[in-house]
Regions:
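Start-transfer (signal-anchor) and selected internal transmembrane alpha helices
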Residues: 1-57, 258, 459-460, 812-829
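Contiguous transmembrane helix-bundle modules in multi-pass membrane proteins
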Residues: 346, 350, 368, 374-492, ...
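Membrane-interface coil-to-helix junctions
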Residues: 48-148, 168, 172-189, 296-303, ...
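Active-site-proximal, structured, solvent-exposed surfaces of multi-pass membrane proteins
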Residues: 74, 632-829
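Extracytoplasmic/lumenal acceptor-recognition loop(s) of multi-pass membrane glycoenzymes
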Residues: 467-484, 504-571, 605-615, 763-764
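Aromatic-rich transmembrane-lumenal/periplasmic boundary elements in polytopic membrane proteins
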Residues: 41-99, 254-298, 479-484, 504-506
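Membrane-embedded helix bundles of polyisoprenyl
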Residues: 141-155, 160-245, 258-277
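Periplasmic/ER-lumenal interhelical loops and adjacent helix-loop junctions
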Residues: 72-73, 255-343, 347-351, 357-375, ...
C-alpha cells in the first residue's frame, strides 16, 4: 500500500494508508476536507427543517410536532435528563423516583437517551426541552450525511461537493425522513453505518486499531438495535472490500482479526449499559408477540420510489432520484472493474432481499420478532445504494447509461402506480426530480470540456436533492398524519406550564408523593412534570411492577408496559401520595390539593391482615395491602341489555362510591356523574357520594361484546375508617425518610416490630439492611428486635459485571497502542 496521491484509485485497488500532505498547505488541506461534510450537513438538516416549516409544525406554526412515543416517551425522558444534569431530579442515572413508584433509569437512559445529541436538551431552559428534542433529528441526520461523505471519500477519492451531495442523499433517505424522524435513538443508527464503514477502511489499512474500537463503542452507545444493524452492515462492507480489493491472504486475515478484536473491545466498553438493559428487558412485563409478515412484493418495490409513503409499517427504502439514477448506472459502468460491480450489486441485492425473508429479518432484529415497524433496518439498504451511486459517479458514468437508468426508474413507477395507497408526491419526485438530476449529470459530463458548466451542475445537484427531499419529508409527515396513532400532540402550552407549576406548589418529596393527576399530558407525566405518581411508560417496565399495581386497580395499556394514575384515596394512602393535581375551573388551569398520607415506609404487624371482603374484589385487594377494612363491597344486581347494562347496589349513605370494570369500554352514567370507560386503561373511578337513599344505580353503554363489570364493580369508601387507618400507619411508621438517588433510609419509632413496608414495587435490584421479603408486590424488610433504621440500595442487575468487562476492555484499549510504541522504540534502539 502506498501513500495518498492526487491520482484517483480504482474501485478495486488497495486502500491508501492515510499518508499526510507535507508543507505549509497542510492546514489548508485539512480545512478543505471539511467542505464536503459541511455541505452534506447543511443540505440534510436544511431540507428537513424546510419541510418542518412548510408543514407549519411547532415552532414554525401551531401544529404539534411530537407524535406517538415522541410525546409520550422521548420528550419526558429528555426532561428527566435535564433534571438529572441540573441536580433537580428525584433520582439519579441508576434509578428514578418519578414514575411507576420508583423504577430503574439506566436501561431507559440507554434506550431513549443514547443518542449523544440528546445532551443538547440540557443546554436549553427546561421549558424548551421539547424544541431541543425536535432539533436532534436534523442534527443527527446532518451528522450522518457528513460521515457518509467522509466514508465515500475513503472508498474512492472524488470532488468534495459530489461526495457532499451524495452524503446528503443518504442522510435524507426515506427511512430517516419517515420511520426514524421522530425517534432520536433510531437515528443514531444512521450515523453508526458510515462511522463503522470508516472503521472498516482503517482495518483494511492496518492502522488505528484503538480508533476502530472507539468507533464501535460510539455506535453501540447510541442504541442497541440500530447499532446491531449497522454492525451487520459493516460486516457486509468488510466482506465486499476483502473480495474486491487486491490483497494477499495474510492481509485479509489481519484485517479480519483487527475488525473482530476491535469490535469485541468496543462492544465490551458499552457493557455497563448493554448488560443491564438486556437483563431489564428479560425482567420486563411480557407483551404479545406477532410473527413477521412480509409485505407484498409490489408494495416492497414501491417503497424504493422517491417520496413514497405508503400506509402503515411498510418499508421506506428510497433515496432521492439522483442517487437512484446513479446507482442504476453502476452495473453498466465499464470504468469500474467487472468483479467490483458484480460483488457490490450482489451484496446490495442480498441485503434488500434479506428484509423480506423471515429468518434473516429476525437476524437483523437480534433474533427477536420485530416490535413496531418491521423494516427498521431499511437505512442499511439506502446506505448501500448511495455507496454504489458514488462509485458510479466517481468513475464518470456515460450519459447513455444514466438515461437508461432514469428510464428504468420511470418505467418502474408506471408499473407500480396501482400499488395500494400509491400517490402523494411520487410522480413529481420521479419525473421532476429525475429530469433535473439527469440534466445536472449531463452538464457535469459536458463540464469536462467546458468547465463553466461544472458549477451549474453542482448547483442543480444540490438544489434537486434539497427540493426533492423537502417535498418527501413534508409528504411523509402529511400522509403519516392520516393514521390515528400519529396524531401530533402538544408538548408546550399554557396548560402544560400551569400543570407544572401546580405540581411544584405542593411538591414534598420524600415526605410524601405528588400525583400529577389526569387528564395527562403524556404517558410519562411523572418524568415530564417531576412528580412521583404511578404514571410510567417504558419497554422496561418490570413484570414485578405490573403484578403489584394491576391487582390494586391502576389502569394500564400496551400489555402492561404503560401505567396510569387513579384518583382513589386508598391507593394514595398505600403509596404515600399526599398531594394531587386536578384540572381547575377554567380550561387549561390546574389546582393542587394536599391530604394526609402515611410516610413512604410503614410498619406492619407480624401477623398479616386479610380483607373480609370477596378476594376477587379490587377493593379487598386494596384493603389487604393497606392493612385495614375501609370499604363496603355490596352485592350488585345486574340488568339491562348487552349494550346498555344496568347495575344497582345498596351502600351506606354519605360514603364515597367507586367503580372498577376493566373489561368494559363505553360510557358510564351514575346520577349526574358521567365517566368514559376504556377497559383496562380506566382503573378505579370515583362515582361521588352515595345518596341519602343509599341506592346506587349505574348504567353502562358499552361496545364490548360478551363482557360485563364482574361480580363486585362497586366499592363504597368509609372515609372515617380510612382516616383512622392513615393515622395509625403514620403514628407507627417512619419518623424520618431520606431518599437519595438510588437509596432510601427510614428512621423508625423505638420498639418497632413486624415488617417495614416500603411504598416501592419490589423490582429486581434492591438490596436492604435485612433480607427482602415480598409484601403484595411491594418492597418489605423484616424487623429484628431493637431495629430503629431500615435502608435499601438499588443497583441494576448486570451493572457490576458490565463495569468489570468495560474496565478490562479499556485496559486492552490502552495497552495495544502502548505495546506498539514500546515495540517501535526497541526497533529504533
Amino acid at each position: 500500500m502506498g501513500t495518498v496521491t492526487s491520482e484517483p484509485t480504482t474501485a478495486d485497488s488497495p486502500p491508501p494508508d492515510g499518508g499526510r500532505t507535507p508543507g505549509s498547505s497542510r492546514l489548508g488541506g485539512r480545512l478543505s476536507r471539511l467542505y464536503g461534510p459541511l455541505l452534506a450537513f447543511l443540505v440534510t438538516s436544511g431540507a428537513f427543517c424546510a419541510a418542518w416549516a412548510a408543514r407549519g409544525s411547532f415552532p414554525f406554526g401551531n401544529t404539534g410536532r411530537a407524535i406517538n412515543d415522541q410525546a409520550n416517551q422521548y420528550v419526558p425522558f429528555h426532561r428527566a435528563l435535564w433534571d438529572l444534569v441540573h441536580g433537580q431530579a428525584s433520582g439519579d442515572v441508576l434509578f428514578s423516583w418519578s414514575g411507576g413508584f420508583g423504577q430503574q433509569f439506566l436501561s431507559d437512559y440507554y434506550t431513549y437517551l443514547g443518542n449523544p445529541f440528546s445532551w443538547l436538551a440540557v443546554l436549553v431552559p427546561r421549558a424548551h426541552v421539547d424544541l431541543a428534542v425536535f432539533a436532534i433529528t436534523p442534527v443527527t441526520m446532518g451528522a450522518a450525511a457528513a460521515l457518509m461523505t467522509v466514508y465515500l471519500g475513503k472508498l474512492q477519492p472524488g470532488p468534495w461537493w459530489q461526495r457532499g451531495v451524495l452524503g446528503a442523499v443518504y442522510g435524507l433517505c426515506g427511512w430517516a425522513l419517515s420511520d426514524a424522524s421522530y425517534i432520536p435513538m433510531w437515528l443514531w443508527g444512521l450515523v453508526a453505518l458510515p462511522l463503522l464503514g470508516i472503521a472498516v477502511e482503517w482495518c483494511l489499512e492496518q492502522r488505528r486499531w484503538p480508533g476502530v474500537a472507539l468507533f464501535v463503542a460510539l455506535a453501540w452507545f447510541g442504541n442497541f438495535y440500530t447499532a446491531m444493524m449497522a454492525t451487520m452492515a459493516a460486516c457486509v462492507l468488510l466482506a465486499v472490500r476483502l473480495i474486491t480489493l487486491d490483497l494477499t491472504g495474510a492481509q485479509r486475515l489481519r484485517a479480519l482479526w483487527r475488525a473482530a478484536s476491535a469490535t469485541a473491545v468496543g462492544i465490551l466498553l458499552t457493557l455497563p449499559l448493554l448488560l443491564p438493559s438486556f437483563l431489564s428487558s428479560g425482567a420486563a412485563q411480557p407483551t404479545k408477540t406477532a410473527a413477521f409478515d412480509p409485505v407484498r412484493i409490489e408494495v416492497f418495490l414501491a417503497g424504493m420510489l422517491p417520496a413514497t409513503h405508503l400506509w402503515g409499517g411498510r418499508p421506506r427504502l428510497y433515496v432521492a432520484s439522483l442517487g437512484l439514477i446513479l446507482a442504476g448506472s453502476f452495473l453498466f459502468n465499464t470504468a469500474i472493474a467487472k468483479k467490483t460491480r458484480l460483488v457490490w450489486a450482489a451484496a446490495t441485492l442480498l441485503v434488500v432481499a434479506s428484509f423480506q425473508f423471515p429468518p434473516t429479518q429476525y437476524v437483523w432484529h437480534g433474533l427477536a420478532v420485530p416490535n413496531g415497524n418491521p423494516y427498521r433496518e431499511a437505512f442499511v439498504f439506502s446506505g448501500m445504494v448511495v455507496i454504489v451511486a458514488w462509485l458510479a459517479l466517481a468513475n464518470r458514468p456515460r450519459l447513455l447509461h444514466l438515461a437508461l437508468a432514469a428510464a428504468l426508474l420511470v418505467a418502474a413507477t408506471f408499473v407500480l402506480r396501482r400499488t395500494d395507497d400509491f400517490g402523494g408526491w411520487t410522480w413529481p419526485a420521479v419525473l421532476g426530480g429525475g429530469a433535473v438530476s439527469l440534466l445536472a449529470l449531463t452538464l457535469l459530463a459536458l463540464g469536462e470540456r467546458r468547465r463553466v458548466l461544472v458549477p451549474v451542475a453542482a448547483a442543480l445537484m444540490v438544489a434537486v436533492v434539497f427540493a426533492e427531499s423537502t417535498v418527501a419529508a413534508a409528504n411523509a409527515d402529511a400522509r403519516r398524519a392520516r393514521e390515528r396513532w400519529a396524531k401530533p400532540a402538544a408538548t408546550s402550552s399554557r396548560s402544560i406550564t400551569e400543570h407544572w407549576q401546580a405540581v411544584r406548589q405542593v411538591d414534598g418529596w420524600p415526605a410524601y408523593r405528588t400525583d400529577p393527576g389526569a387528564p395527562q399530558t403524556s404517558y410519562n407525566d411523572g418524568l415530564a412534570l417531576r412528580a412521583q405518581g404511578p404514571q410510567y411508560y417504558s419497554s422496561y417496565l418490570p413484570e414485578a411492577t405490573y403484578q403489584a399495581l394491576e391487582p390494586l386497580g391502576y389502569g394500564y395499556k400496551n400489555d402492561g408496559r404503560t401505567f396510569f394514575g387513579a384518583d382513589n384515596p386508598v391507593l394514595d394512602a398505600i403509596f404515600s401520595i399526599g398531594a394531587r393535581v386536578r384540572p381547575g375551573a377554567t380550561p387549561g388551569s390546574w389546582t393542587a390539593t394536599r391530604s394526609p398520607a402515611p410516610p413512604l415506609v410503614t410498619v406492619r404487624p407480624a401477623t398479616p391482615y386479610t380483607s373480609p371482603h370477596p378476594a376477587d374484589s379490587v377493593y379487598a385487594r386494596q384493603e389487604t395491602v393497606l392493612g385495614a377494612t375501609v370499604y363496603e363491597v355490596p352485592e350488585v344486581t345486574r340488568g339491562g341489555t348487552a349494550t346498555a347494562q344496568t347495575y344497582a347496589a345498596q351502600c351506606t349513605p354519605g360514603s364515597e362510591a367507586y367503580w372498577y370494570s376493566p373489561e368494559l369500554y363505553g360510557t358510564l352514567h351514575a346520577g349526574a356523574t358521567r365517566r368514559q370507560l376504556e377497559d383496562r386503561m380506566s382503573g378505579v373511578l370515583p362515582l361521588g357520594p352515595v345518596p341519602a337513599s343509599g341506592r346506587l344505580e349505574v348504567t353502562v353503554d358499552t361496545r364490548t361484546s360478551g363482557a360485563d363489570a364482574g361480580a363486585h364493580p362497586i366499592g363504597c369508601l368509609d372515609r372515617p375508617a380510612l382516616d383512622a387507618a392513615v393515622g395509625h400507619l403514620t403514628a407507627t411508621g417512619a419518623t424520618k425518610v431520606t431518599a437519595g438517588g438510588h437509596t432510601i433510609e427510614a428512621t423508625l419509632p423505638k420498639g418497632s416490630t413486624g415488617t417495614a413496608v416500603l411504598a416501592v414495587t419490589a423490582v429486581p435490584g434492591w438490596q436492604c439492611s435485612a433480607p427482602v421479603r415480598p409484601f403484595h408486590g411491594l418492597l418489605a424488610v423484616p424487623l429484628p428486635p431493637d431495629t430503629d433504621k431500615v435502608s435499601c440500595t438499588f443497583t441494576p442487575k448486570g451493572l457490576t459485571p458490565g463495569l468489570a468487562a468495560a474496565v478490562l476492555a479499556l485496559l486492552t484499549l490502552l495497552a495495544v497502542p502502548l505495546t506498539h510504541r514500546l515495540r517501535r522504540r526497541r526497533e529504533r534502539g
